[in-house]
Amino acid sequence: MGSEGWSRRRFVGALTGAGAAAVLPACNDAPPPTDPTAAEAGTSTPEASTSAPARSRAPSGPRPLYVGTYTSVEGGGTGIGLATYDATSGRITKTGTLTGVGDPSYLAVHPNGRTLYAVNEREAGAVTAVRLSDRKVLGSRSTGGGGPCHLSVHPGGRWLLSANYTSGSVAVHPIDASGALGERADLVTHSSPAPGPGQEGPHAHQFVTSPDGGHVLAVDLGTDTVYTYRLDERTGRLGEVAQAHTRPGAGPRHLTFHPGGRYAYLANEVDNTVAVCAYDPDGGRLTVGDAQSTGTGSGTNYPAQILVTSNGAYAYLANRGHNSLTRYAVEADGARLRLLDTVPVSGDFPRQIAFSPDGTLLFAANQKSGTVSVFHVDEDSGELRLAGEPFASPVAVCALPL
């Protein structure tokens, strides 16, 4: 099944039960595909903001929803789940499955809304492009590493960024005018610093672009480090400019930026904390603040992903072990998080969360229960209200609402 590191990441939930392991916030300018209610696609041969989009009026009619899964585990899916959701009620309706994409555990959409990208989380990792208008798989490219677990599209739309968990590396692929991927432009392995306590090597977990677009940041759970790079937008090559270190053993997993662009919030998987980080857009330097509580007690929790509302007033953290969402008030223009409460997620092992494009709904992909929970988000209070019964989807590990 691959290396020890990949097995731990993929099956971390086995410590508390059976099962298989953003934002992904939807791009707010992404139109729906031509036929969002298309039925099951035929078998084919083988994003990028980290905060909520600005609120707008809820669109009318069904909106597309894509659900990532594992295809190579017992009880897993057979491809990318296709569904629609009602932007007012939050109700999800299944429309089919896009087959021909193996282990699509994380998804992102191109800024123009025409192409969907998926990782193929396997030992020989790859990324796959899918044209949304007719659900055609445009092809896959090697990530140069094992267990790719995250990807995002650079805001310019010309480069795909991906993170290889097992090999602790990040990759860059060119995107052509059709949305298809070219040969890998760069691959960087996190060889320094040395792995943190209890880690056997680097484990890249996320690769995203800063709000100003000037830098790309890679979060590595294995080295307790966030790496900042400059991306050469002509060649796709990466140049490291800074490293930010958490406390030893924190195990950083996912980062999200405040809309103001001067602060970011880091979810630490291993020590069950979050941290406020100051960010200097000129030099790309991130400074990690003190660890803060997730509000889940002392038990094993595995925080997964953190999101911030478009008005910068509230943040939400997915807690896989506690099966909850922690709600924080964001204060001092982004410099401070104040814990408010935790809300049951109505599912088991919420691995990923995402806002709808208008920010009125929050989707949680619950890996072990095989469900997607939807919550109404109160703009003024930040309170979450469950929108009906969770939607059944096998080994749901990523929900991408457009």
Where in this protein do the model-derived segments appear?
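Asp-box/WD-like beta-propeller blade repeats and closely related beta-sheet repeat scaffolds
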Residues: 138-205
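Short loop/turn segments immediately following beta-strands, especially the blade-tip
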Residues: 84-89, 132-133, 174-181, 230-236, ...
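Beta-rich, blade/repeat-based domains predominating
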Residues: 76, 101-111, 144-155, 192-211, ...
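N-terminal export signals
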Residues: 2-4, 10-29
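Short loop/turn segments immediately following the C-termini of beta-strands
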Residues: 70-72, 121-122, 165, 175, ...
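A short beta-strand motif characteristic of beta-propeller blades
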Residues: 93-98, 137-141, 192-197, 239-245, ...
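N-terminal low-complexity, Pro/Thr-rich disordered segments
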Residues: 23-61
